[in-house]
């Protein structure tokens, strides 16, 4: 078992990084009137850990008995019948899934899942909670139609179903959905908190950590706790005892994006743009999210840029990221950003050096 799963807090009492949020969630459960919830915060901040600990607090050990299945939904859209297959985790008390995986058909999935859960409402025999919990991940990636559908169904079936929504950015969730949930902000842990977690894991695994080793991993993780723990375990597998100057190796795709940035800085031409496009295709084929590619590419380019250009380049990166979210072909927008960058940078070089 990976350390990131082995040392994940299983109950709200054991949560240390977001202890105040955990205590507030405990109060909600104690009052037995838990509303719909929207957890939002950066990747690796601990949203999923809090959600699973909350479900266990609500339903006890039964929530741990989880099975994974690929379920096929047969849906009548009115004009035709469609079949959608999605992976889902479920226990007797909750279902967890990612409806955005269904693409443009996500709204049908949202409607059908909530309807089915409402039909299979648990019997309130011994004062137990007579509702099931539906955990929806990456709600910010749902289409507008799916979010409107979500708002209607969460109102209709609120007596038998509670929704826990997770996303990285609440600004991409419609106001209608946000206003019907209790919003829970989960901040990225500080580097000091990450160091404490790494030292705790090191102690449990009987590892000797050189001075400053945990701090270097924390700095390298960009305040992503999940990534920091994975880096820590990677270092252990690669070399133990640890050395005083040991660092975690960069992720392969991040190294590849760094090489793309270097290529762009060396030459600005249609030939180089075509070569960069081929490299983008390789990243996308290997399921690297286009938003992550653009963000990493921007960070690498900014390291090499004159300060006079940074504001303009950030503006265009934001512009093409927005376009990318509205469109369906990410490669067009990644290539357009690189073309725009090449144009701006070439003009800057000509005006500066002639």
Swiss-Prot record:
Quaternary structure (record): Heterotetramer of subunits RFC2, RFC3, RFC4 and RFC5 that can form a complex with RFC1.
Protein name: Replication factor C subunit 5
Induction: Down-regulated by sucrose starvation.
Any single biological process term in GO: DNA repair
Single GO cellular component term: DNA replication factor C complex
Tissue specificity comment: Expressed in roots, leaves, shoot apical meristem (SAM), flag leaves and panicles.
Main subcellular location of this protein, as a coarse class: nucleus
One Gene Ontology molecular-function label: ATP hydrolysis activity
Function: May be involved in DNA replication and thus regulate cell proliferation.
Keyword Nucleus: yes
Highest taxon above the source species: Eukaryota
Location in the cell: Nucleus
CDD domains in the record: AAA (cd00009)
Record keywords, A-Z: ATP-binding, DNA replication, Nucleotide-binding, Nucleus
Stated family: Belongs to the activator 1 small subunits family.
Binding site for ATP: 40-47
Entry-linked PANTHER family: REPLICATION FACTOR C / DNA POLYMERASE III GAMMA-TAU SUBUNIT, REPLICATION FACTOR C SUBUNIT 3
A Pfam family of this chain: RCF1-5-like_lid
């Amino acid at each position: 078992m990976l350390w990131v799963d082995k040392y994940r807090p299983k109950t709200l009492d054991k949560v240390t990084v977001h202890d105040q949020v955990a205590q507030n969630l405990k109060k909600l459960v104690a009052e037995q009137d838990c509303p719909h919830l929207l957890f939002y915060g950066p990747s690796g901040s601990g949203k999923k850990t809090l959600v699973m600990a909350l479900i266990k607090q609500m339903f006890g050990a039964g929530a741990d008995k989880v099975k994974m299945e690929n379920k096929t939904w047969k849906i009548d859209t009115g004009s035709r019948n469609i079949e959608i297959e999605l992976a889902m985790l479920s226990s007797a008390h909750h279902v967890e899934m990612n409806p955005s995986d269904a693409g443009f058909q996500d709204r049908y999935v949202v409607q059908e899942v909530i309807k089915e859960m409402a039909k299979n409402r648990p019997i309130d025999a011994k004062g137990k909670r007579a509702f099931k919990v539906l955990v929806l991940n990456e709600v910010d990636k749902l289409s507008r139609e799916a979010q409107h559908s979500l708002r209607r169904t969460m109102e209709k079936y609120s007596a038998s179903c509670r929704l826990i929504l997770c996303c990285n950015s609440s600004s991409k969730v419609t106001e209608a959905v946000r206003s019907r949930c209790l919003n829970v902000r989960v901040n990225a842990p500080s580097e000091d908190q990450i160091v404490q977690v790494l030292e705790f894991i090191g102690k449990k695994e009987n590892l000797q950590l050189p001075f400053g080793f945990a701090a270097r991993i924390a700095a390298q993780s960009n305040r992503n706790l999940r990534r920091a723990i994975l880096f820590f375990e990677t270092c252990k597998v690669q070399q133990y005892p640890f050395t005083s100057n040991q660092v975690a190796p960069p992720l392969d795709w991040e190294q590849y994006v760094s090489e793309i940035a270097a290529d762009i800085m060396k030459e600005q031409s249609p030939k180089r743009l075509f070569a960069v496009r081929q490299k983008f295709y390789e990243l996308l084929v290997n399921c690297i999210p286009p938003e992550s590619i653009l963000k990493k590419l921007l960070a690498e380019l900014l390291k090499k840029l004159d300060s006079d250009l940074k504001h303009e380049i950030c503006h265009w990166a934001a512009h093409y990221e927005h376009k990318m979210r509205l469109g369906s072909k990410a490669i067009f927008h990644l290539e357009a950003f690189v073309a725009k960058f090449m144009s701006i940078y070439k003009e800057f070089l000509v005006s500066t050096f002639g």
